[in-house]
């Protein structure tokens, strides 16, 4: 295996590792978006389930329920910018993953081409070595 093949093999291995890391980071970013969206949905459901108790109720209990409803709404609305930011970060990580995959595929093609050239060169050397030996044998046979 010549130097070019070793270099291309090493490059392909590095690109595979880089793609794996980029895919992991992209998956984490997508998971964060999913978690935030799930949290927002849970807050919406909690807010929807807040109902005043039937029967006599004190003003303090109504005030506490109103305060809780306001806090749930506020938390849900404040998740919007965070989710948008997480989505843009996830999109950026996905773009990085695609670029890493493209680099990996390119490195694998270069590695395959280098292997093919090395194999052809080895076959060529074998053919030339075979011809050289045959002509030596003919010369030895003629001198006998």
What is each residue range found by the language model?
Residues 1-144:
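Charge-rich amphipathic alpha-helical interaction elements
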């Amino acid at each position: 295996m010549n130097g070019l093949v070793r270099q291309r093999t090493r490059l392909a291995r590095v690109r595979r590792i880089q793609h794996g890391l980029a895919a992991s980071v992209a998956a984490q970013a997508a998971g964060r978006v999913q978690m935030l969206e799930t949290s927002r949905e849970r807050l919406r459901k909690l807010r929807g389930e807040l109902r005043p108790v039937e029967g006599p109720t004190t003003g303090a209990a109504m005030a506490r329920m109103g305060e809780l409803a306001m806090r749930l709404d506020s938390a849900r609305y404040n998740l919007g910018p965070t989710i948008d930011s997480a989505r843009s970060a996830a999109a950026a990580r996905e773009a990085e993953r695609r670029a890493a995959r493209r680099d990996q595929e390119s490195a694998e093609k270069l590695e395959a081409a280098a292997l093919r050239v090395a194999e052809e060169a080895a076959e060529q050397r074998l053919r030339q070595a075979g011809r050289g030996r045959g002509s030596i044998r003919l010369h030895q046979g003629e001198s006998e």
